[in-house]
Amino acid sequence: MRELPLVSLITVNYNGLDYTTELLNSIRSFSYAPLEIFVVDNASVVNPEKILNQNYPEVKVIRSEKNLGFAGGNNLALPFAKGKYLFFINNDAEFTSNCLQTLVEFMENHLDAGVVSPLLCYFNESKTTTSDLIQYAGMTQVNALTARNKTIGEKERDTNQYSTAQKIAYAHGAAMLVRQKVLKDVGLMYDKFFLYYEELDWCERMRKEGLNCYVEPNARIYHKESAAVGASSALKTYFLNRNRILFMRRNKSSLKLIPFFIFLIFFTIPKNVYTFFVRGEFKLLRAFLEAVKWNVVDINRKIFSKKVNYSMPRDYIFKN
């Protein structure tokens, strides 16, 4: 049997130590070897280093003194990651048997793949038991006019309808296995997104370098969706809308952006303003308008960077 390659598992914690420990316990239950584990703490109110070091000595903890967001937090661990593959997983997710091995074997047999995600299923509403309700079995391409796309299989009952690996438009940031060489060929995740759309942007850049994105449904992860961010919070409204526009700016040509901006100005903005106002959701309305404003102010700034930058902020702490 071929020797399994080293995998560097990276998860980001932000005021969610209970979720992080549940993830680490599930990793112990369904171990893959060889494996190195990194927990990046994104400036949680209570520093979790002591607890993690005492109870999970195999875990390497990286502490940032400011919240760097999803991409920035994950990127912080990359200079220390030695694995042939990098497994990015949300701390509000849990492992299943042979998940990581199945993903690694897929990558070993598909050299065109830059990234592969497992099938994602929801926990039940109490977040205490798993369910057969699918969250993700792939994603379609982002529409050039609306900047929206579809999550394949979302909220379907799992009846084994997704049983073979498929080429897809985008991996899911909650769980994705990436080749280490992607960092050199494509670059890091773009940390300006902070929250949402980072993996979609990364997948677009991978495709431009000739690498494909896949889903392998024979590997499964359970995800406690919205455990970290409220389902209709102002935070989520702001970053989803801000980053949807930023994604289009980064990945579409000037010619293709013309119909998108026409649709945005004359349909998307009026529709959202009207909807939030009629519902009395004034915090969400303000968040939406701030998202649009951010892109107007940011429009002339440089938004493209391929170079891999391993320089570290001064405020990181690395613990063996």
Descriptions of predicted regions:
Residues 76, 95, 102-188, 192:
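Acidic/His-rich active-site region of diverse nucleotide-sugar glycosyltransferases
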Residues 25-34:
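Short, acidic, metal-binding catalytic loop of nucleotide-sugar glycosyltransferases
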Residues 35-43, 62-64:
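Short beta-strand/loop segment that forms part of the nucleotide-sugar
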